A protein has these predicted regions:
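N-terminal subdomain of lithium-sensitive/metallo-dependent phosphomonoesterases centered on the IMPase/IPPase/PAP
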Residues: 1-100, 266, 273-276
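Small-residue (primarily alanine) positions within well-ordered alpha-helices
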Residues: 23, 27-30, 62, 128, ...
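Residue-level signal for inorganic ion chemistry
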Residues: 34-37, 59, 70, 103, ...
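Short acidic/glycine-enriched loop/turn segments that link adjacent beta-strands
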Residues: 51, 135, 247-250
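Generic detector of well-ordered alpha-helical packing
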Residues: 60, 83, 99-102, 106, ...
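DPxDG-like acidic metal-binding loop motif
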Residues: 89-148, 163
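An extended, acidic
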Residues: 155-276
Length: 276
């Protein structure tokens, strides 16, 4: 393939590999910086949308490191970051960055926080990395290339009965919304194995991908929360959609081991009917 000026362009697979290499390098650098900083102590913690929606100096420093790294490696790409990064581009590639997904866990020194970097083209996620520094775990995927944990292939669980499913979810920063969501879960918790709440969407998606949980659902997220994780889950054989089974979107996402998607979708939809 050649560009208009005659230069050879990378194939889709080559491009995905290049994007993955950039993302992996930057996720490791940013995550290790944040981990070292957390061990040294936090000095600048502020609130965002609510009194419980936090941002630390390391959220911002991580995003700056990643944005500068992407701009140096791929200056024509667009970038969108949780902490305000917004760079327009001309290449057709857009990066979605969550510099620390699970900031509350980071604040409390719980290990379930991650750096999430996804690169998308017009067809959706093309390459994704979720790095969990406190666990030393790097989840990676490229479109059509499979999903990996520290270089080893991963796949979702082979579970067929939703009553045996360990299900993860997340709750809103809004107290009113949290109450509605908790009531919803209470309506079907007796019909599944149990509920877990990790506190980081990117990690939840990766844990479905590698079989540590069987399903994950949440609402009112952003593209930077799910861009990398949903690709990793897809490449690991998971099924994703909104709660009713249509195209997954940040406003509403359900990702499961493939055989239980419809069963869990029905439980969530039935439980949600009572709060509308």
């Amino acid at each position: 393939v050649q560009s208009e000026n005659g230069a050879n362009l990378p194939t889709a697979d080559q491009l995905a590999s290049q994007l993955l290499q950039v993302a992996t390098t930057l996720a490791k650098q940013a995550g290790d910086m944040a981990l070292a900083g957390r061990k040294a102590g936090l000095h600048n913690v502020q609130t965002k949308s609510t009194a419980t929606d936090m941002v630390t100096e390391f959220d911002r420093a991580s995003e700056v490191l990643i944005v500068e790294g992407i701009r140096a490696a791929r200056p024509e790409d667009a970038i969108v970051g949780e902490e305000g990064a917004s760079v327009s581009g001309t290449s057709g590639i857009t990066w979605y960055i969550d510099p620390i997904d699970g900031t509350t866990n980071f604040l409390y020194d719980l290990p379930a926080w991650a750096v999430s970097i996804g690169a998308e083209d017009s067809s959706g996620p093309l390459a994704g990395v979720v790095y969990i520094p406190a666990l030393g775990e790097m989840f990676t995927a490229t479109r059509g290339g499979g999903a990996f944990l520290n270089g080893a292939p991963i796949q979702s669980n082979n579970i067929a009965d939703v009553s045996q499913a360990l299900v993860c979810t997340g709750f809103s920063y809004s107290a009113d919304q949290r109450t509605i969501q908790a009531q919803r879960v209470s309506r079907f918790i007796h019909q599944i194995r149990d509920i877990r709440r990790a506190g980081a969407a990117a990690i939840d998606l990766c844990f479905v991908a590698c079989g540590r949980i069987d399903a994950y659902f949440e609402e009112n997220l952003h593209q930077w929360d799910i861009s990398a994780g949903i690709l990793i889950a897809h490449e690991a054989g998971c099924r994703s959609g909104d709660f009713s089974g249509h195209t997954p979107r940040p406003a509403e996402i359900l990702t499961t081991a493939p055989a239980i998607f419809d069963q869990l979708s029905q439980l969530i939809m039935a439980a949600s009917a009572s709060d509308r």
